[in-house]
Amino acid sequence: MDYRNQSLGALAIAIPQATKLFRQHQLDFCCGGKQTLLRAANKLNLDIDALEAQLSALQTEPHSSEDWQQQPLTNLISFIISRYHDRHREQLPELVLMAEKVERVHGEKPTCPRGLAAELSAILEELTQHMYKEEQILFPMIQRGMGSQASGPIFVMEAEHDAVGQQLEVVKQLTQNVTPPEGACNTWRALYTGINEFITDLMEHIHLENNLLFPRALRGE
């Protein structure tokens, strides 16, 4: 199968386990989901043949992931809210508190991620507003069968997805790609574990919206 000329978003839909592989290689399948595997791999100097072999192996593995290409959009929306929106509302406040503690206790160390708490607070504020707009405006439009008329709100939501993607890059820079330094305390390690989980969740969340929900809604499904 020709994987290299397919978009990252299409591959993530067709091979659900591919999202973990893409994350390992820093391949942006959510906000950058429209670029082909070949183009994305070339940007990062990745071995395209090795990536295709890994994707081929993943495609033969059995999996139990929901096929959201076939499910009604109302079901997909309910899943996004319960699995991702509600989860982000739990994750981010705790991450902010832990980041504040790490900066307060370890602020004099050169490895301290100074500015991380402020960046996470900004993500919390902006993502909270973003999810509210989706739940109060865009999702009800789609649920009422008006998705084909929602190009304006969808454009805004995708732009906000791009913005939070840039904020995640700042978080990665502040945390040495979310890697705790040698000798990091338990709070520091727990913070970075939580950030990694949040990034994984958010990328899957944006992928489902950008590459599945929004295109299907615009087609009038």
Swiss-Prot record:
Pfam families in alphabetical order: Hemerythrin (PF01814), ScdA_N (PF04405)
MF GO annotations: metal ion binding
Principal location listed in the UniProt entry: cytoplasm
GO BP field: protein repair; response to nitrosative stress; response to oxidative stress
Keyword list, A-Z: Cytoplasm, Iron, Metal-binding, Stress response
GO cellular component annotations of the record: cytoplasm
CDD domains: Hr-like
Superkingdom: Bacteria
NCBIfam families named among the record's database cross-references: FeS_repair_RIC (TIGR03652), PRK10992.1 (NF008221)
Protein family according to the UniProt entry: Belongs to the RIC family. YtfE subfamily.
Function: Di-iron-containing protein involved in the repair of iron-sulfur clusters damaged by oxidative and nitrosative stress conditions.
HAMAP family the UniProt entry points to: RIC_YtfE
Name of the protein: Iron-sulfur cluster repair protein YtfE
Lineage: Bacteria, Pseudomonadati, Pseudomonadota, Gammaproteobacteria, Enterobacterales
